[in-house]
């Protein structure tokens, strides 16, 4: 999604893709990990390492965070965020357009009341209960797989190069630890390389981002 935003921006962009154009079993192994707590899909089955990422598994179900998701809650240790839902709104609107849904419909009570044909719904008291009520939308986009939907745009792009089978193994910082100077990449054949750039965007998801950060401990 970040690379899509930068198409035809005039910036020279290199997108590092851990997998290939389509899912490959040997690269999916890199997504393995251990789940703790309630049983859920294995980490390598619920994510895809390929162009388009997890959109290749996506059924189109969407739901934004709510304002109180960012609040500190007495029954959730370490809860509370330094940002609010208002900080994300502009990005939610743009993401909704890309996903083929309407951001405003999440908050349009009239729309959902009409859809319920005379029935009504009541939100749970989320501050004092583990129970929650959420409104979901399902995208009616003809093609939900970004690897297909945006393939032609990337192939014809004049400013973006995509490097496949380029798994980031470490962010290389300067000696002060104040900025990233380069990233180390490798493939499963043992080939290694270093990529330098003026700016880096780490956009690998909620699990792979911290994995890479934790592996980047040469100085700190």
Regions found by a protein language model. Give the residues of each.
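Short amphipathic alpha-helical segments
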Residues: 3-5, 27-28, 48, 213-215
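Glycine-rich loop(s) and the adjacent beta-strand/alpha-helix scaffold that form part
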Residues: 5-8, 21, 171, 183-220
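Hydrophobic or amphipathic alpha-helical targeting/insertion segments
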Residues: 13-18, 23, 54
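Redox-cofactor-proximal catalytic regions of oxidoreductases
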Residues: 32-106
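Conserved redox-cofactor binding core of oxidoreductases
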Residues: 74-77, 81-180
């Amino acid at each position: 999604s970040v690379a899509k935003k930068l198409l035809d921006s005039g910036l020279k962009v290199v997108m590092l893709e851990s997998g290939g154009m389509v899912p490959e079993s040997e690269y999916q192994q890199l997504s393995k990990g251990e789940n703790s707590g309630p049983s859920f899909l294995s980490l390598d089955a619920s994510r895809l390492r390929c162009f388009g990422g997890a959109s290749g598994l996506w059924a189109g179900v969407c739901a934004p965070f709510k304002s109180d998701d960012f609040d500190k809650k007495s029954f959730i240790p370490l809860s509370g965020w330094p940002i609010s839902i208002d900080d994300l709104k502009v990005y939610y609107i743009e993401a909704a357009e890309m996903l083929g849904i309407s951001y405003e419909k999440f908050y349009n009570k009239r729309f959902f009341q009409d859809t319920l044909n005379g029935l009504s719904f009541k939100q749970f008291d989320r501050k004092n209960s583990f129970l929650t009520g959420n409104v979901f939308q399902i995208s009616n986009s003809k093609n939900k797989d970004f690897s297909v939907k945006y393939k032609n745009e990337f192939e014809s792009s004049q400013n973006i190069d995509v490097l496949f089978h380029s798994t980031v193994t470490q962010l290389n910082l300067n000696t002060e630890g104040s900025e990233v100077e380069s990233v180390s990449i490798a493939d499963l054949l043992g080939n290694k390389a270093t990529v330098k750039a003026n700016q880096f965007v780490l956009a690998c998801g909620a699990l792979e981002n911290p994995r890479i950060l934790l592996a980047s401990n040469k100085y700190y």
